[in-house]
From Swiss-Prot:
InterPro entries cross-referenced by the UniProt entry: KRAB, KRAB_dom_sf, Znf_C2H2_sf, Znf_C2H2_type
Keywords assigned: Activator, Isopeptide bond, Metal-binding, Nucleus, Repeat, Repressor, Transcription, Transcription regulation, Ubl conjugation, Zinc, Zinc-finger
Spans annotated as Interaction with AR: 417-714
Protein name according to UniProt: RB-associated KRAB zinc finger protein
Subunit structure comment from the entry: Interacts with AR and RB1. May also interact with other nuclear hormone receptors such as NR3C1/GR.
Pfam family membership, one: zf-C2H2
A GO CC annotation given for this chain: nucleus
Residue ranges of domain KRAB in the record: 8-79
Gene: RBAK
Transmembrane segments: none
Tissues expressing this chain: Expressed in bone, brain, heart, kidney, liver, lung, pancreas and placenta.
Stated family: Belongs to the krueppel C2H2-type zinc-finger protein family.
Length: 714
């Protein structure tokens, strides 16, 4: 067994990728690569390797993509580096006690037990034939012992006229075009294709001027072996038969069947034990790698490495557009697409494009219906792991995301970010048609339809169209709703309040007010009676000074001062500052009245209307005048009444300047200027401005009719 001729360098254990090759790796392979390379470098440092930190290590530590530029020389493209692939795999899978078949000198193959430490594995493995170890560099004249030293000694990398490989088009120095052969037999192109398919990675490369010092035939055959991946062949230093192919057929068969690790849960197979172990953690939930800062656990070491950077304050990558900073260059690259609008990933099903591949993968689950993340509590499944995590907090009650301004907490980070805009006033979404800004992308989407007049939701029953799915669903209830619940006592039908209706027969009033002892049949009537909650009112409107004890009330009130009305009705064009207001308004068009009175069966479009209506049956009048003690069933009636004490008359006529205490009085008065007389007598055709005058006139006809009847009876 030969040992290494010369010191161990980082290039002897490094594997490089071009940008194209790097993009072909899946995320797990990239993480594994990062772990292995960083571990290899740490081993070298631990045994005394002392030199400038390689660029690839710097890139990996900073989270950058470690692929090399076209002009750089890739470490893995020498024959020894290909043998080092086995070395790296054994370091990664150090639990596997048996080493792979080792290269041997003079056509002899040795197989022996390897130790798990890096130094023992490396020193016991002969990487290249002894006959090609000692060479002089043609550029600098140095006498070098190892291929890695020979390759790295020259910085010029001048290229001479090359020969060309007829299989892949790569160019090499030397006259003889060598082939895979044994006893003159040439392997077919089909067999070469099979070798390409069983290769883990395709690694094309070029050699520089320094490689003229080596046997050109050996270099060219080493290039052909790049399509094979594993190195089961014997090394031979006897000239043209540099690689012996006697074991090729057996190796080819073993490679095509080389996925011995099968998952018993899902049946997926793996060629590497390390990947199989990582995959199993997806089923077991095992997360052995814990962050020592926040305690968060991960199933892969590479994922933990990336996570640790989130705790670092250093964010060297800054966006020139918006100033946002990132700790990884990859994150900056992805962020820049939000400004450029670049979306390189397209869905083959619907044509929708995305700026990140992960977003495309998640979107495609909408088409496939795949929901791989089930909740252990309720069995509900989700297409995203983050959605499952958010959902599970609804079972635990945990709210991790807290607003620093008002202290309100949320299950989801995205909900917190949206909420914080109510404090900052940020409106990042702009309409390209009119330039209006919105705080949520959903608001912008709804608004944009007002420009397009798009109404994609059509009712199959009546043909009516809607621009909102929610409005369409509410409208359908008009056609499908039936009174299917019959009271066994009186035969009355009630879809919504059958249980409450039964209590009316039992004369049971389960809802009692703790303040006055009054009882109610239904919870809605009880809620309407209860006094407002007492306590500190910490939210003050800076426009009118009004106080609120809940942020949601304050937010809704504040919009009454602003001109923002992002919610537009697709039917009549009326706009609203709150989505709930639009929701209620649309019932005017759909005819939906979901709130039913359990007493008389009357339906209402709003719950507040039902609550007020209930007071007719209960006789409740919760609003009392502090001046005279008169009580009212509605707050609006109390407000109007109070003006009789204060003398306030806020409604002024634009024509004559006369003022009124009620808006209805102003409306009636305005008819004297417009000449409108909406009330017409069916008897004589006379018209009136006021209903009261019309009613008085009607009495004249009724009295006249009574006199005629009296005369006829005489």
């Amino acid at each position: 067994m030969n040992t290494l001729q010369g010191p161990v360098s980082f290039k002897d254990v490094a594997v490089d990728f071009t940008q194209e090759e790097w993009q072909q790796l899946d995320p797990d392979e990239k993480i594994t690569y990062r772990d292995v390379m960083l571990e290899n470098y740490s081993h070298l440092v631990s045994v005394g390797y002392d030199t400038t930190k390689p660029n690839v290590i710097i890139k990996l530590e900073q989270g950058e993509e470690p692929w090399i530029m076209g002009g750089e020389f890739p470490c893995q493209h020498s024959p020894e580096a290909w043998r080092v692939d086995d070395l790296i795999e054994r370091i990664q899978e150090n639990e596997d006690k048996h080493s792979r078949q080792a290269a041997c000198i003079n056509s002899k193959t040795l197989t022996e037990e390897k130790e798990n430490t890096f130094s023992q594995i490396y020193m016991e493995t002969s990487l290249v034939p002894s006959s090609i170890i000692a060479h002089n560099c043609v550029s600098c004249g140095k006498n070098l012992e190892s291929i890695s030293q020979l390759i790295s000694s020259d910085g010029s990398y001048a290229r001479t006229k090359p020969d060309e490989c007829n299989e892949c088009g790569k160019t090499y120095h030397g006259e003889k075009m060598c082939e895979f052969n044994q006893n003159g037999d040439t392997y077919s192109h089909n067999e070469e294709n099979i070798l390409q398919k069983i290769s883990i990675l395709e690694k094309p490369f070029e050699y520089n001027e320094c490689m003229e010092a080596l046997d050109n035939e050996a270099v060219f055959i080493a290039h052909k072996r790049a399509y094979i991946g594993e190195k089961p062949y014997e090394w031979n230093d006897s000239g043209p038969d540099f690689i012996q192919m006697s074991n090729f057929n057996a190796y080819q068969r073993s490679q095509m069947e080389m996925k011995p690790f099968e998952c018993s849960e899902c049946g997926k197979s793996f060629c590497k034990k390390s990947k199989f172990i990582i995959h199993q953690r997806a089923h077991t939930g095992e997360k052995p790698y814990e962050c020592n800062v926040c305690g968060k656990s991960f199933s892969q070491k590479g994922t933990l490495t990336v996570h640790r950077r989130s705790h670092l304050e250093e964010k060297p990558y800054k966006c020139n557009e918006c100033g946002k900073t990132f700790c990884q260059k990859l994150h900056l690259t992805q962020h820049l697409r939000t400004h450029s609008g670049e979306k390189p990933y397209e869905c083959s099903e619907c044509g929708k494009t995305f700026c990140q591949k992960t977003h495309l993968t998640l979107h495609q689950r909408n088409h496939s219906g795949e929901r791989p993340y089930p909740c252990n509590e309720c069995g509900k499944s989700f297409s995203r792991k983050s959605a499952l995590s958010d959902h599970q907090r609804t079972h635990t009650g945990e709210k991790l995301y807290k607003c620093n301004e008002c202290g309100k907490s949320y299950y989801r980070k995205s909900t917190l970010i949206t909420h914080q805009r109510t404090h900052t006033g940020e409106k990042p979404y702009q309409c390209s048609e009119c330039g209006k800004f919105f705080s949520r992308v959903s608001y912008l989407t709804i608004h944009y339809r007002s420009h397009l007049e798009e109404k994609p939701y059509e009712c199959n029953e009546c043909g009516k169209t809607f621009n909102l799915n929610s409005a369409f669903i509410r409208h359908r209830k008009v056609h499908t709703e039936e009174k299917s619940h019959e009271c066994s006592e009186c035969g009355k039908f009630s879809q919504l309040y059958l249980t409450d209706h039964h209590t009316a027969h039992l004369e049971e009033k389960p809802y009692e007010c703790n303040e006055c002892g009054k009882t109610f049949l239904v919870n809605s009537a009880f809620d309407g009676h209860q006094p407002l909650p007492k306590g500190e009112k910490s939210y003050e409107c800076n426009v009118c000074g009004k106080l609120f004890n809940e942020l949601s009330y304050y937010t809704e009130h504040y919009r009454s001062h602003s001109e923002e009305k992002p919610y537009g009705c697709s039917e009549c064009g009326k706009t609203f500052s709150h989505n709930s207001s639009l929701f209620r308004h649309q019932r005017v068009h759909t005819g939906e009245k979901p709130y039913e009175c359990y007493e008389c069966g009357k339906f209402f479009s709003q719950k507040s209307y039902l609550t007020i209506h209930h007071r007719i049956h209960s006789g409740e009048k919760p609003y009392e005048c502090s001046k005279c003690g008169k009580v009212f069933s509605r707050m609006s009636n109390l407000t109007v009444h109070y003006r009789s004490h204060s003398g306030e008359k806020p409604y002024e006529c634009n024509e004559c300047g006369k003022v009124f205490s009620q808006k209805s009085y102003l409306t009636v008065h305005y008819r004297t200027h417009s000449g409108e007389k909406p009330y017409e007598c069916n008897e004589c055709g006379k018209k009136f401005h006021h209903r009261s005058a019309f009613n008085s006139h009607q009495r004249i006809h009724r009295r006249g009719n009574m006199n005629v009847l009296d005369v006829e009876n005489l």
